[in-house]
Amino acid sequence: MDDLKMLRGLGRELEHEPPGSLVRQRQRLVDAARGRPRKVRLPSRWALVGMVAVVTAALIVVPAVLLRKGDLRPVDQPNPFAAGSGKMLNVLIMGSDARSRGGPARSDTLVLVHLPADRKHVRAVSVPRDSLVRIPACRTAEGKLVSGGTGPINAAFTLGGAPCTQRTIESLTGVRIDSTVTIDFGGFKKMVDALGGVEVTLPKAVTDKRTGLSLPAGRQRLDGTRALAYVRVRHGLGDGSDLSRVERQQRFMASLLRQAKSQQLRNPVRFVRFLAAAAGSVTTHPRLDVPALEAIARSLEKTGADAVTFSTVPVSPSPHDPNRLAWDRDAAAALFAQFKAEN
């Protein structure tokens, strides 16, 4: 099949559930300050990199620390990822639902994280998966050249994996990305189960026929399978929009991290199981080795939770497809300018 033809059809093939209604989407866009990052206060220092990005920090940094038995010894050679190295760091985080039944893999979550050279603050920008964008020609990890076209932004991952997603984000933002981190959703379920489940509190009961998810109102503990359905469902919870789903994911991840930290103190064996599941859930491109991970962890030691900002790419309903979102180019350019120049 021609790559461009495949791309044009991905809008229908990739979405197992339609986007929220245009009315709800418009209302959310009106309610939010366009492009204005909001402060996010996280529950503990363990949650440093803000919401979804926090999970990645835990997944790639904590296993590295464990390999060194918790001793973050300084490396002998200067590391470009360390604070004071004069190097800022941009990391693209993706949540992927790689399919076991032969279907196309998709990137469900996209977050671009910026660590300035002094590591005094962290910026994380979420990219709605309903964004309709131009996907440039790119090469896969195996070196295959795939043609581009216009399509939903998560189609880039289906066409060419992490390299094509990185190329697409770089072309849209003008930001150079140092590393791409992919979190496998199958591993996500194992992580939740390794902790014995994660607690959530629902203001009302949730029933979704598409996923089979059925949850009562109130406080409850979710196992891995139900947790994954909970963070991905769009109907019957919130206003049905992609933006509402992103916020729910963020709250769940913060709860997961609080519980992981608690298990570290109360049940070390269970915590080690969690780390093992986490280590098996993440891949990086280009690969981040242990010294790089240690340097990132050390550089964030003095970064307070109040120094973390989280925002979403400013968008509006696409004039070409009412079920998709178009970026506000000027506002997005101003937002991502912070990723290219130190303040």
Can you say where each PLM-predicted feature lies in the sequence?
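Core hydrophobic alpha-helical transmembrane segments of single-pass membrane proteins
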Residues: 51-61
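N-terminal export/targeting signals for secretion/compartment entry
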Residues: 1-52
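Non-catalytic, solvent-exposed segments at the cell envelope interface
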Residues: 43-47, 61-343
